[in-house]
Amino acid sequence: MTTYKTLFLTRRAPVHQKMALEAAPEILKIIMLRDANKESILEHIKDADFLITEREDPIDREILEAAGRLKLITRLGSRVWDIDLDTARELEIPVCRLPLNSCIHVAEHIIMQMLTLARRVRECMNVMNTREWDKEPRLCTEDLFAYNWSGRTGMRLLWNSTVGILGFGEIGNELAIRLKAFGCQVSYNKRNPLPRKAEVSLGITYQDKETLLKDNDFVISLLPFIPGTEKLVNDDFFNSMRRGSFFVHSGGSGVVQEESVIRALTNGQLAGCALDTFSWEPVRDDEPILEPSRNFKVNLVLTPHVAAGGTDIQKANPRTVYYENIVRLIEGRPLTHQVV
């Protein structure tokens, strides 16, 4: 059986690497490199048949010219600005992108979290369930109705809000695209700023962390759980934010200090908070964060680590899709999402 050397560049944790490897077809000999430096890439690319990349450092002319056998580049995600497309075109190396279903799910979940906080949806739902109003019902007509009959206050718009995103990867990319439709002014912070052309394309601007925290109506955390981020979102973090702003976290588990969330909501530093991941999962029965969530007047939205979709979604979008275009090329079938 003919096998093909496939270089897989990633920044993901070992558990995700293992799942990606298990999904690979037998005909592929996968060399997976995490956070590889350029020298290592140049060494392995020389005899590679295929390249799969989800890293953000450039796949530049030097790397492409060193790839004497390369037949295809697959970029996991929607972004391709980290690949020298002109050189790929010149060397006749096809490039395909692969929009990740899971990242799109998370981006939509975050929009839901933001709207739920801004419109105080939990409080409004509780009003309906508990009949918290003192007006007598009347049959509505064209001219007779009772707008806001329960007297809700504090509802805000997502439209034209300032939004700061911490940890800008594929999810941040998908989120920024969707926030455009709400007229939001989006800034971001990450270890290595994006190329200027990427910022212009997405309509986003880079901010240092301190400025991002204090200048935005919404702070969205997509930070992964890696060395240096454990409990990074704590009292100091929230006290650095604009008073009365919103905080949303759909990043890695273990990044947020939940007790700090409670304090920030109690003292009014936060107008609302939404969390999808937690320090303990499943959440322990006596976890302090559960207590304020039982009070519907506290603007706290908790979801059980489902931003990427349910088990049915995961089964419908297996990791074998990472290798789909490689198999298509080997079998002589048309490629999908081809950009070069």
Describe the predicted segments one by one.
Residues 244, 250-340:
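Rossmann-like dinucleotide-binding domain for NAD(H)/NADP(H)
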Residues 34, 76-77, 93-104, 251:
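Short beta->alpha connector loops at strand-helix junctions that form conserved
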Residues 8-9, 163-165:
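Hydrophobic Val/Ile/Leu positions in short beta-strands of Rossmann-like dinucleotide-binding domains
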Residues 46, 58-64, 191-288:
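Rossmann-like adenosine-cofactor binding region
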Residues 107-126, 177-184, 321-333:
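Oxidoreductase and adenylate-handling cofactor-binding alpha/beta cores
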Residues 99-162:
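Phosphate-binding beta-alpha-beta segment of Rossmann-like dinucleotide-binding domains, i.e.
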Residues 1-48, 187:
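N-terminal glycine-/charge-rich "phosphate-binding" loop or analogous flexible N-terminal tail
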Residues 171:
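Hydrophobic/small residue at the entry helix of a nucleotide-binding pocket
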